[in-house]
């Protein structure tokens, strides 16, 4: 299921925290045969946090009915007959694992959340014939305000399992999520860098955004509110993002923003230009198809209100892309959106500091730091169409977390791995191979993709020393760089870390351990002849799947 075509639930989930659970057809995948995915799959929760007791809640919606699931995976609708005044919900808690222990429950087909709390149970209420009132801890009177808790979002249906870590509402207790495939491999995401949990708070407060941080009565940090909530309760100023939006609106009075919302449909484009206070977008035929009023700070941080994105194939995708460009502050620097180069995200001084820091502290750089962080596939989500099991690992608040399963997309820089020895083409896609342009072995000749031909420029020898060689030279990361977008070229073999590679047979990634990043086709899909090759954060996309 392409990230940019799925029905994103992020906006829905963010809205729910303030009021009532009314889940739409969120995270719905391409349907597979009904027999492909059983009614429940095992979910193992491991407690590496060093804290407890842990209480679990599996809450969500099935066929338009909201409810909860017990440890055996049985779904229970919330009681009906409730009026507009909220009443306590039945206790849906499941006893979680103690420190250093694991608990396995059954995860049913739902679109919802798995909550977990530390030390005490959470309070939930129902209203209006069985709708759930979610925690809204931006309100100091919320009964869960002083409880340490977090959650993961998931959808399990006939199309498989989608599960993600999220920071859309707040940054709090660290965790990883994972899915086991039929071949036994575990795809995972959400792991922080060493000491990343506290580093986030320190940097946030140092940047003047400390008003978002909520503390317990004993002074310990509980969470940092997402600015989408903080702006509405006066915890941060709107001045900086307002200034940025004004500059963006003025910039596009005299030039077009070109939105290409679907990576697999490069010919589908919309051009936008500002007229008065309205950003008006046209189709290829010149017809106006969407218009957005100049948004206030709440609309930008929350990707809603003035930037509301309906579940359609025109207005919604344009709104999502425009909001992502504003949140990541790339709208001024790149008129072609979405911006494919994450190295340029959050560089403006007026940027969303919360989102910037959330991505910085993730081991794989992926986060769900705002509602449409999935624009361009930068979200912390894993999916499999035939899931065998799901995992949540509650990580330590300090120190270094252990990667979930085989590491998946959270594999740490420097983790050793094998490179199968041999000689042959390095294939990508159906017809392309890694190629030395013009078969020229000159140092610093940047490698590319080219139609497979079997010539010497496409014959790569993989050594037991981790090198990949062609034409007597080594595949080399330019100047030992570690940043996204660093060129990969051929260079005289010298034994440095810039010339070492490992191969993950599960994800088909060629990874440079020194940088912790992967060999990547510049610009991503669609793959094409002449496309240059670079270093990029490992993301398991088509642009990083190499066949030896």
Swiss-Prot record:
This is Glucan endo-1,3-beta-glucosidase. Keywords: Cell wall biogenesis/degradation, Glycosidase, Hydrolase, Lectin, Periplasm, Signal. GO terms for biological process: cell wall organization. One of its GO terms (molecular function) is carbohydrate binding. Residues 38-396 form the GH64 domain. Belongs to the glycosyl hydrolase 64 family. The active site is at 153 (proton donor), 169 (proton acceptor). Lysis of cellular walls containing beta-1,3-glucans. Implicated in the defense against fungal pathogens. It catalyses: Hydrolysis of (1->3)-beta-D-glucosidic linkages in (1->3)-beta-D-glucans.
């Amino acid at each position: 299921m392409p990230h940019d075509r799925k029905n994103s639930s992020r906006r829905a989930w963010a809205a729910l925290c303030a009021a009532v659970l009314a889940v739409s057809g969120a995270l719905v995948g391409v349907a597979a045969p009904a027999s492909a995915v059983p009614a429940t799959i095992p979910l193992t929760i491991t407690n590496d946090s060093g804290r407890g007791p842990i209480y679990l809640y599996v809450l969500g919606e099935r066929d338009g009915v909201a409810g909860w699931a017990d440890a055996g995976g049985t779904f229970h609708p919330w009681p009906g007959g409730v009026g507009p005044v909220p009443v306590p919900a039945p206790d849906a808690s499941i006893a979680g694992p103690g420190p250093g222990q694991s608990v396995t429950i059954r995860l049913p087909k739902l679109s919802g959340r798995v909550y977990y709390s530390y030390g005490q149970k959470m309070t939930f209420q129902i209203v209006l014939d069985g709708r759930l009132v979610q925690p809204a801890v931006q309100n100091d009177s919320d009964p869960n305000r002083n409880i340490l808790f977090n959650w993961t979002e998931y959808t399990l249906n006939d199309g498989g399992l989608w599960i993600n870590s999220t920071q859309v509402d707040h940054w709090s207790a660290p965790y990883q999520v994972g899915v086991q495939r039929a071949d036994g491999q575990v795809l995972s995401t959400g792991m922080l860098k060493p000491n990343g949990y506290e580093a986030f708070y320190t940097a946030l407060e140092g940047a003047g955004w400390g008003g978002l941080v909520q503390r317990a009565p004993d002074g310990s940090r509980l969470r940092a509110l997402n600015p989408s909530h903080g702006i509405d309760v006066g915890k941060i100023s709107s001045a900086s993002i307002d200034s940025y939006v004004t500059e963006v609106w003025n910039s596009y009075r005299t030039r077009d923003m070109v939105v290409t919302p679907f990576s697999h449909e490069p010919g589908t484009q919309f051009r936008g230009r500002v007229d008065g206070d309205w950003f008006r977008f046209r189709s290829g035929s010149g017809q106006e198809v969407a218009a957005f009023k100049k948004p206030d700070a709440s609309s930008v941080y929350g990707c809603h209100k003035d930037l509301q994105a309906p579940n359609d194939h025109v207005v919604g995708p344009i709104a999502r892309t425009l909001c992502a460009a504003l949140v990541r502050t790339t709208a001024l620097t790149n008129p072609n959106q979405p911006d494919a180069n994450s190295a340029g995200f959050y560089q403006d001084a007026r940027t969303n500091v919360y989102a910037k820091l959330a991505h910085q502290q993730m081991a794989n750089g992926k986060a769900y730091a705002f509602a449409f962080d999935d624009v361009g596939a930068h979200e912390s989500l894993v999916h499999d169409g035939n899931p065998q099991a799901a995992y949540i690992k509650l990580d330590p608040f300090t120190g270094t977390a252990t990667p979930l399963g085989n590491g998946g997309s959270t594999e740490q820089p420097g983790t050793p791995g094998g490179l199968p020895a041999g000689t042959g083409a390095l294939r990508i896609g159906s017809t392309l191979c890694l190629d030395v342009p013009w078969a020229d072995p000159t140092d610093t000749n940047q490698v590319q993709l080219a139609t497979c031909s079997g010539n010497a420029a496409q014959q790569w020898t993989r050594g037991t020393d981790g090198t990949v060689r062609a034409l007597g030279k080594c595949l080399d990361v330019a100047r030992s760089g570690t940043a996204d977008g660093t060129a990969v070229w051929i260079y005289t073999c010298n034994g440095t870390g810039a010339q070492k590679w490992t191969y993950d047979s599960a994800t088909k990634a060629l990874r440079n351990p020194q940088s912790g990043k992967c060999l990547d086709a510049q610009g991503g899909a669609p793959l094409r002849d002449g496309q240059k090759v670079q270093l990029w954060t490992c993301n398991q996309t088509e642009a990083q799947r190499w066949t030896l």
